[in-house]
Amino acid sequence: MEPRAVAEAVETGKEDVIMEALRSYNQEHSQSFTFDDAQQEDRKRLAELLVSVLEQGLPPSHRVTWLQSVRILSRDRNCLDPFTSRQSLQALACYADISGSEGSVPDSPDMDVVLESLKCLCNLVLSSPVAQMLAAEARLVVKLTERVGLYRERSFPHDVQFFDLRLLFLLTALRTDVRQQLFQELKGVHLLTDTLELTLAVTPEGNPPKLLPSQETERAMEILKVLFNITLDSIKGEVDEEDAALYRHLGTLLRHCVMIATAGDRTEEFHGHAVNLLGNLPLKCLDVLLTLEPHEDSVEFMGVNMDVIRALLIFLEKRLHQTHRLKESVAPVLSVLTECARMHRPARKFLKAQVLPPLRDVRTRPEVGEMLRNKLVRLMTHLDTDVKRVAAEFLFVLCSESVPRFIKYTGYGNAAGLLAARGLMAGGRPEGQYSEDEDTDTDEYKEAKASINPVTGRVEEKPPNPMEGMTEEQKEHEAMKLVTMFDKLSRNRVIQPMGMSPRGHLTSLQDAMCETMEQQLSSDPDSDPD
């Protein structure tokens, strides 16, 4: 049914005509998410009529039908203006039972009406900055969190819970003030951690089900997304013991999340949200990933249960198969694994054994191949600076931040970016809490070590001598041509001669020489003025 015909039916004021038209329109457009521009004015007219009835009060027996029509029209970004008035948003909040006003909805609201209203609010908040502002000013987050807090005591339909959480996610994703309000004033981390525990159905023994059902998976992912939003910028610093205990408890739940599968094909997506949130936890709280007691079926290394680390490594390998949005795909899990390896020697040694096993193939470039090491080394020269930074940092930590070891496994050419950023081009080792791990060389590596090109990280075939057969005069002529070309490139600033500063940073050759001379003068007692 066309929107013009529906608008004309609404204008008749006859209930049976209106209901027939709305039901027909709703059924026809239940799955419509794109709309014909030619009918845009008709849809706006219909939206204004619906808003007029919405603000005056929907007929109690047909609220769901009216709200379904509002929901369909709220998908059209060109028809949002009528719905984004303060009165309209307040009316929808009342029907969703999340308004602060009194007496708008009965004590036991119709859950179908609540659900449709929540869907309308989600559409409006997603697409309209005005709706986002009005929702924040109306403090809808307060009533939403109150209802979320009742999930343990009262039974709510899955869809109502899901859209409660979806609306929370949208508000916290789009409004900084709502994020801060939920984190600080409403104690959102505690509330949502408790809700996550309830959703995962963790038993008193601390064991969730082996397979998370579909509905629980959907709700858990929304909870994880809201928690990610409110912790993103809030807990980067030191936390007190009470907060640390809360984040460790959240960490144990996230540990469960990365260890279980979900019904359907959403396991990797579910694990991704859990890993993203792990990256927001205080670093000292990540120790919960290694506190599982070893058991018969667990992966044990140096007396520590490595099941979670192995699960994260498997997740990383899956994400490395993706070719788009690598930053969002691999950076979070690499960051978590890096911090675990940095702080816990057993985790570092286990990961090194899996990612950087003793070198045997010394004739292939480190970035060539399908082993995990090869894929990570390839990322070290990725166009996205964040991707190459986290990949290099992970491998560097697995090498106990030893420059020679790092170059051995990645090649100097691949390692140069991180070494330059760290001021380690001249070698050395940064300060770190690392024991002197042994790095066992294979017989193949020992035999070929002297022939390995440190830049490429492999044994290179000896190239033919390009000057073979030339006279000394010809060699001198070619050398002068090369000097002239370099001089021209340098004068035109196409290239710039570089040198190593005393602090290990790449800098212009002139600056490097000046710094070196200054350092020599400052350390020479005879250079003091008379």
From Swiss-Prot:
The modification Phosphothreonine is found at residues 440, 442. Pfam families: Ric8. GO terms for molecular function: G-protein alpha-subunit binding; guanyl-nucleotide exchange factor activity; protein folding chaperone. SUPFAM superfamilies: ARM repeat. It comes from the Eukaryota. Coiled coil: none annotated. Keywords: Chaperone, Cytoplasm, Guanine-nucleotide releasing factor, Phosphoprotein. Disulfide bonds: none annotated. One of its GO terms (biological process) is G protein-coupled receptor signaling pathway. One of its GO terms (cellular component) is plasma membrane. Phosphorylated at Ser-435 and Thr-440 by CK2, stabilizing its interface with G alpha proteins. Interacts with GDP-bound G alpha proteins GNAI1, GNAO1 and GNAQ, and with GNA13 with lower affinity. Does not interact with G-alpha proteins when they are in complex with subunits beta and gamma. Interacts (via C-terminus) with RGS14; the interaction stimulates the dissociation of the complex between RGS14 and the active GTP-bound form of GNAI1. Interacts with NCS1; interaction is favored in the absence of Ca(2+) and myristoylation of NCS1 is not required. This is Chaperone Ric-8A. The lineage of its organism: Eukaryota, Metazoa, Chordata, Craniata, Vertebrata.
